[in-house]
Amino acid sequence: MLDIQLFRKDIDAVAQRLATRGFQLDVAAFQALEAERKQLQTQTEELQARRNSLSKQIGMLKGKGEDASAVMAEVGGIGDTLKASAARLDEIQAHLGELMLSIPNLPHESVPVGNDETQNVEVRRVGEPRQFDFAVRDHVDVGEKLGLDFDTAVKVTGSRFSMLRGGMARLHRALVQLMLDTHTQEHGYTEMYVPYIVNAASMRGTGQLPKFEEDLFKVPRKVGSEEGERIENFYLIPTAEVPLTNIVRDAIVAGDKLPLRFVAHTPCFRSEAGSYGKDTRGMIRQHQFDKVELVQVVPADQSFDALEQLTGHAEAILKKLELPFRTIVLCTGDMGFGSTKTYDLEVWIPAQNTYREISSCSNMGDFQARRMQARMRTGQGKPELVHTLNGSGLAVGRTLVAILENYQNADGSVTVPAALQPYMGGTTRLEPEL
């Protein structure tokens, strides 16, 4: 959530920056709410001053033994007006709060201005795509002979799910172990095991609610209280960013404890409500997929350096796996809702003859921290909002896809990348099942 003082100071400048990311701020609606809020607050202050003055008069009149009923009646009337004003002011504040929750983050000045993904800017490429001397097969054709099973997953659950068997399942696990070991042992992250179901407050804190509710899997639950039963909504996590970042919700962290670096391996659950017809074949776009997530909590003046660092941590996994990739900076029109700057890592997918996203690394600035009231304190100073960052380190399923395609052999086998062989008991190749 953005600082409302930015809007009160120069709403036109804010609207212009938001427009670069395709968001049209309803300036008139905001200004109308603000005008009424100011009018109500002024009226309330004047009425409170009048009531205080009259209350003193009542005391003086009673002290003299004089009739104070008229003044008391006026005080009673002021009280009724104040109650009505307070109720309306609460409504105005609620409307302003809802409006602020619906507004995305401001792009950083270093972000290229653009309308969509076609205007993202490539920063660097690492590795050269392999030249095959045989017809390249996609990960579905390669994987189904090695233990990648879509048919059983469809029977058990439905479309956009998959099962892994034998060597494929082991390769998937090896990827997770490599990622966690690298991030904890080389990059200084603390490994966390987190809930896969979170409450609505956590989803609001990181920005999934209220805007993206249709993309989430909701878990309604009956909760009992003295007033009776009510339904409380919980949610399957779309990313470990949600529970990891909410660790600091409603907390004041000592400045000397920062930066905090968390990593977690979790399944992620997404309804893909807006993805009908996209990537219907294979593992690229699933309702359930595994991801190793990186989260950092840092002081405000360190967040952009931390973004470069975090992006490098994700890149390190691709380098270890010797997978060709490129890093791009997203333009204003392609950034996520809460991000002020984002780098995407895209891995080479031979069968598609293109690069596909495998990690997104974002600096959220104080956008999430303001929603969560996540703060830091240095010495005896006043609490200040922290900055939060997150990134995939990496999406496990898409990394598996990249390995199946880039390391495939003419006989249908897949060479196990050298970095994974210690996690595979020395296995160097996955052979087609008999």
UniProtKB/Swiss-Prot annotation:
L-serine binds at T239, A240, E241, E293, S392. CDD domains: SerRS_core (cd00770). ATP binds at R270, S271, E272, E357, I358, S359, S360. GO terms for molecular function: ATP binding; serine-tRNA ligase activity. It is found in: Cytoplasm. The keyword Signal does not apply. It catalyses: tRNA(Ser) + L-serine + ATP = L-seryl-tRNA(Ser) + AMP + diphosphate + H(+); tRNA(Sec) + L-serine + ATP = L-seryl-tRNA(Sec) + AMP + diphosphate + H(+). Keywords: Aminoacyl-tRNA synthetase, ATP-binding, Cytoplasm, Ligase, Nucleotide-binding, Protein biosynthesis. InterPro entries: aa-tRNA-synt_IIb, aa-tRNA-synth_II, aa-tRNA-synth_II/BPL/LPL, Ser-tRNA-ligase_type_1, Ser-tRNA-synth_1_N, SerRS_1_N_sf, SerRS_core, tRNA-bd_arm. Pathway: Aminoacyl-tRNA biosynthesis; selenocysteinyl-tRNA(Sec) biosynthesis; L-seryl-tRNA(Sec) from L-serine and tRNA(Sec): step 1/1. It comes from the Bacteria. Gene3D superfamilies: Bira Bifunctional Protein, Domain 2 (3.30.930.10), Serine-tRNA synthetase, tRNA binding domain (1.10.287.40). The keyword Kinase does not apply. One of its GO terms (biological process) is seryl-tRNA aminoacylation. SUPFAM superfamilies: Class II aaRS and biotin synthetases, tRNA-binding arm. One of its GO terms (cellular component) is cytoplasm. Its EC number is 6.1.1.11. Catalyzes the attachment of serine to tRNA(Ser). Is also able to aminoacylate tRNA(Sec) with serine, to form the misacylated tRNA L-seryl-tRNA(Sec), which will be further converted into selenocysteinyl-tRNA(Sec). Homodimer. The tRNA molecule binds across the dimer. Consists of two distinct domains, a catalytic core and a N-terminal extension that is involved in tRNA binding. Belongs to the class-II aminoacyl-tRNA synthetase family. Type-1 seryl-tRNA synthetase subfamily. This is Serine--tRNA ligase. It comes from Cupriavidus taiwanensis (strain DSM 17343 / BCRC 17206 / CCUG 44338 / CIP 107171 / LMG 19424 / R1) (Ralstonia taiwanensis (strain LMG 19424)).
